Regions:
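A short core secondary-structure module
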Residues: 125, 152-189
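Alpha-helical interface subdomain recognition
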Residues: 1-83, 102-105, 114, 118-119, ...
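Flexible, small-/acidic-enriched active-site or ligand-binding loops
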Residues: 137-139, 157-158, 183-217
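N-terminal glycine-rich flavin-associated loop
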Residues: 86-106
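Short beta-strand-to-turn element immediately C-terminal to the catalytic PLP-Schiff-base lysine
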Residues: 101-103, 143, 169-172, 181-184, ...
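Structural signature of FAD isoalloxazine-binding scaffolds in flavoprotein oxidoreductases
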Residues: 66-75, 134-138, 182, 210-212, ...
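A generic structural signal for well-ordered coil/turn residues at beta-strand boundaries
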Residues: 120, 134-138, 163-165, 176, ...
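A short, Trp-centered hydrophobic/proline-enriched beta-strand micro-motif
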Residues: 118-129
């Protein structure tokens, strides 16, 4: 099949790339990651006001843009390219998607316009101290029944969990799984920012002590949550594609100017092979990711498998590319002053997000019956 971006999509991507280059260069990223929030609130508001990023997947009837997963994919690719710390991923994949999928009309009317305007951020608290992203990792139980329940326990590795205005918590409800909305400043909720390898994706530990929560739709099977994770996997893959390409470009440019034995190191066969392999990883990962986004946008039956293929392929490719970018740079690539290590940190951390690459391939095997 032939899949190409439209002229409008290409122009949108280019304009976003320019905005990120002007407003969030790597030098600014290094300053932002030192802050308590871990992301730039003024940049987020600019993304909302000038580019409409938080409104992309919000339907027009809720003051959104009514775009598709393809446009959201393009956003993530550019955010990854600039390793921009931003609540876009959590708010979109772990906020807008579950609300659209499971929320009541009242909840959609209440939350989505504020999201579209960039007024509130969202996230989902799924993993617990075990770090397991599957159903076996959920031990928190929703106490009570009906529209309002209470939650007690611990959630870990919650993306933007220390700053999100609304948190969607995954908890057991009998033999099913429920999603529950909690205010970020709810009584009994303690939020602690975690120290993580990827400095550009802040995470938090959330302690719940009889915290009041409102159900997001009715409890159901894990397949409901799998859909949210599939969308997240596709967007995460797109972010890795952008970061991977930026990392590769960094290595290529350095190989052109770094001389050894009176010639550029890029002229040596060993370096040429590694750079060529990086290009293969980028193109392969982009192809898998674009198809997954297309399948999700069109509602194709193979979206669940395509999402896992994209995530696993991009995770392996990004880990390879970021690692060899450091190697091509030699000793300087390991230093704090060089940007190569920021991409390497993101690669190794993202490789485990939503489950390791091995876990992803095993889940794919289960889905296709192997």
């Amino acid at each position: 099949m032939q899949f190409e971006l439209s002229d409008e999509q290409l122009e949108f991507q280019k304009s976003l790339r320019r905005m990120i280059s002007d407003r969030s260069p790597i030098k600014s990223v290094r300053e932002v990651i030192k802050t308590d929030a871990g992301w730039d609130e003024s940049l987020w508001q600019q993304f909302a006001d000038q580019a409409g990023l938080p409104a992309l997947l919000v339907p027009e009837e809720y003051d959104g843009a009514g775009a598709t997963l393809v446009e959201a994919m393009l956003v993530m690719e550019e955010l990854g390219r600039g390793i921009v710390p931003s609540p876009y991923f959590a708010t979109t994949a772990f906020g807008v998607v579950p609300i659209l999928t499971f929320g009541s009309e009242t909840q959609k009317q209440e939350l989505l316009p504020s999201v579209a305007a960039g007024e509130i951020t969202l996230t989902t608290a799924l993993t617990e101290p075990s770090g397991n992203w599957g159903p076996d990792g959920v031990e928190m139980v929703a106490a009570g029944s009906g529209e309002t329940v209470t939650l007690s326990g611990t959630k870990s590795f919650v993306i933007d969990g220390h700053t999100a205005d609304k948190i969607i918590v995954v908890a057991k409800a009998g033999d099913q799984y429920g999603l529950y909305i909690v205010d970020g400043d709810a009584s009994g909720l303690t939020r602690t920012k975690q120290t993580t390898l990827d400095l550009t994706r802040p995470m938090a530990t959330l302690e719940f002590d009889n915290v009041a929560a409102t159900g997001l739709g009715e409890p159901g099977g894990w397949d409901r949550i799998s859909h949210v994770l599939d969308v997240a996997a596709t967007l995460l893959a797109a972010e890795m594609v952008g970061a991977m390409e930026a990392s590769m470009t960094m290595a290529v440019e350095y190989a052109k100017v770094r001389n050894q034995f009176s010639r550029a190191i890029g002229s040596f066969q060993g370096i040429k092979h590694r750079l060529s392999e990086m290009a293969v990883e980028v193109d392969t990962s982009r192809a898998a990711t674009w198809y997954a986004a297309y399948a999700g946008a069109e509602g194709l039956d193979d979206f669940p498998t395509a999402a896992l293929v994209a995530k696993a392929t991009a995770a392996a490719g990004f880990a390879f590319t970021a690692s060899w970018t450091v190697q091509v740079h030699g000793g300087i690539g390991f230093t704090w002053d060089h940007d190569a290590q920021l991409y390497y940190r993101k690669a190794k951390s993202t490789e485990l997000l939503l489950g390791s690459t091995t876990d992803t391939w095993l889940e794919l095997a289960d889905r296709i019956g192997v």
